[in-house]
């Protein structure tokens, strides 16, 4: 016969596990690799490519689980954005150079996001560079962008300013009657 010592088995399990199966986080680096209309990176168009999201042609609005574009709560750093597009929905108001993360929750979102039925799109802006001043400039087919960032107090607080302006008005102007004051352009300024 063999004597065996007593074996004690203990275990722990959380009674409630927190999982969000309907939340998708898309890194901005991945969004920047998606082919874009006239080279203009568009966060809203990238969201339209996700599973469970439908789009309409030529518009930055998106449909989630049968709801309309007005049933999506869009937040920029926690602040609601009510009109998230320019030029009738061709371009979104979000400058990809100023964005850090994009998260889409397609259902089962917390009550604090009330007032919408379909989804919550959370967009967080980048923090400025805490170590050194830095700038980026981009000239594209339809717009130009400038981003400046740096420390206000080194390693404590920082700033980021990102601006974008289209120059579609320069292309359209020769085809417009001289008597009209109609211009076709937009500009954005994001600062944090």
Predicted segment positions?
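N-terminal periplasmic accessory domains that precede
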Residues: 1, 43-46, 62, 89-95, ...
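Short, acidic, small-residue-rich periplasmic hinge/interaction motif at the N-terminus
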Residues: 1-35, 44, 69-71
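Short acidic/polar hinge/loop motifs at secondary-structure boundaries
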Residues: 33-35, 79-106, 184
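Extracytoplasmic beta-strand/coil segments of soluble accessory domains associated
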Residues: 35-83, 100
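Transmembrane beta-barrel outer-membrane domains
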Residues: 55, 116, 130, 137-141, ...
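Transmembrane beta-barrel wall of Gram-negative outer-membrane proteins
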Residues: 140-165, 178-192
